[in-house]
Amino acid sequence: MDFINRTTPEIAKDLLGVKLIFDDGENQFSGYIVETEAYLGKIDEAAHSYNGRQTPRVQSMYKDGGTIYAHVMHTHLLINLVTQPAGTAEGVLIRALEPELITDQMIENRNGKVGIDVTNGPGKWTRAFNMSMALDGLRLNEGPLSIDTKARKYPSSILESPRIGVPNKGEWTHKPLRFTVEGNPYVSRMRKSDMLAAEDTWKKHK
């Protein structure tokens, strides 16, 4: 997948349906991305790199597109994929996945949570997959975290909406930079009345 020669929102949309795979050394976990958010670097008041901010914790954002930027928020590990050439500091937050298979190990990692609650949030799926900050700064597909763009799915419909948890950021609070597979029950904060059967949210053929 090209993480450099397209806009970050375009990449965030194209990641929906892509298969993400993580191997923790003992178990392999996989799922299809159903929710992403784009962060547009130095101009984006919600981005960690806003105004060119550079601290030790955000250095990975300044690397080439395809780098993993991991950070912890409220004890939750969040995984972002860096986009654009080195120094641009834009990226895509992976907010939720539809598991290829919910395994007993995933349920154990989520302290007994079952069903959609296993992976329907940015800190939930990373815990289910037993991820750690050791991923920060690594290259996608060159270590334990990879994506498969051939075994992917294609959303029947994509919704665009404001990002979650971005208050008091002026126009950036309201920009439609969150992308979701419409109706997929694994999308975070999905109302039950809006949920469809997961298989009905994907195109039957490309």
Swiss-Prot record:
Q: Does the keyword Acetylation apply?
A: no
What Gene Ontology molecular-function terms does this entry list? Answer: alkylbase DNA N-glycosylase activity; DNA binding
Entry EC number(s): 3.2.2.-
Q: Tell me any Pfam family this protein matches.
A: Pur_DNA_glyco
Asked if the record carries the keyword Hydrolase, the reply is yes
Q: Which GO terms describe its biological process?
A: base-excision repair
SUPFAM superfamilies per the UniProt record, alphabetical: FMT C-terminal domain-like (SSF50486)
- Domain of life, per lineage: Bacteria
Keywords noted in UniProt: DNA damage, DNA repair, Hydrolase
Family, per entry? Belongs to the DNA glycosylase MPG family.
* Identification of the protein by name: Putative 3-methyladenine DNA glycosylase
Species whose genome carries this gene: Staphylococcus carnosus (strain TM300)
